[in-house]
Amino acid sequence: MHFKDLGLHDYTLKNLMYENNCCKFYDAVDENNISYVLKFVPSDVTSEGDTFPFVDRFQVKEGVFLVYSSNDFGKEGTDYFTYTGSGGNEVHISGTSSEAGIKPQFIETCHPKHLKRGTKEQEDINSSTSKKSAVINNFSGEKTPNPRPQSSNISERETYVGILNVKCKNKNSSKIRSEKLVSSVIETKHTPGLASILSKEGTTYPNNADGKHISIVNPSSKIYHSSHKQIVKTPIPKSGLSPIERCPFNGQNIKCYSPRPLDHESPQRDFNNNFQLRILKSSVLQRRQSTQNS
């Protein structure tokens, strides 16, 4: 396709280099056979504005052409449109660091709560860099000395990316000691914590008391059945007891109860005794039935 008298030069499109939903890139030359890159933006697509400087611009019926110098794309590499540039977050590096001449990459780490390290913490970091250590590079796998051991003094927030392999002379297993802050407990000669429990219940704690005198019953030791019923003992009337008689048994006098009173004073008393006896029997029967049902 040939464009004449539309821009500063006459451009001839050679081939399509790249295409997406919003634009197309063409390889083109002018009348002097100088290479250019033309970007075509259709008229129905709203462009936010190109940040890359163009050398020429002209409009056609279908859209707008932006002309870029091919030398400007040459410094970015052969793949113009997938290169992230300085604003990209990720750069894919192929090959080893020694062959490509890539400098060790550093990442910026932030201290917790965005606070500066204290004097003691900074001294520990400086002393750790002076120890003998080997760094295994992620790219080549070869052991190289730790780069820039004095860099911790210059920049506190730079950390070398790699696998740190520290050689320890001590063959025994190292023990890590951790210090925990424990709230101070006032130790007394009494059982700790018992005085506070008794004070909440309003019970005074004597000075000469011993923890052995206090027994705590575990409530879980008493297990009740779901159909448990509290059985009330039936009171035995005192007047219902028969008089005691002495019954000889093997030459010994044994106390035994007579089935009915020895002295019959009146029929009214016999009636009362029989009535109380019937009540006693009925209560016993009720207790037996309740236990059998349960």
UniProtKB/Swiss-Prot annotation:
The alphabetized UniProt keywords are: Cytoplasm, Phosphoprotein, Stress response
Q: Which stretch is the leader sequence?
A: none
- PTM-bearing positions, type Phosphoserine: S266
Query: Looking at the UniProt record for this protein, which Gene Ontology cellular component terms does it annotate, in alphabetical order?
Result: cytoplasm
Q: Where is the composition biased (Polar residues)?
A: 125-153
Q: Which GO terms describe its biological process?
A: positive regulation of transcription by RNA polymerase II; response to salt stress
This entry's comment on induction and repression of expression is:
By salt stress.
Which compartments does it reside in? Cytoplasm
Disordered: annotated span: 115-153
Q: What does this protein do?
A: Involved in salt tolerance.
Report what the protein is called: Halotolerance protein HAL1
Tell me which species this is from.
Answer: Saccharomyces cerevisiae (strain ATCC 204508 / S288c)
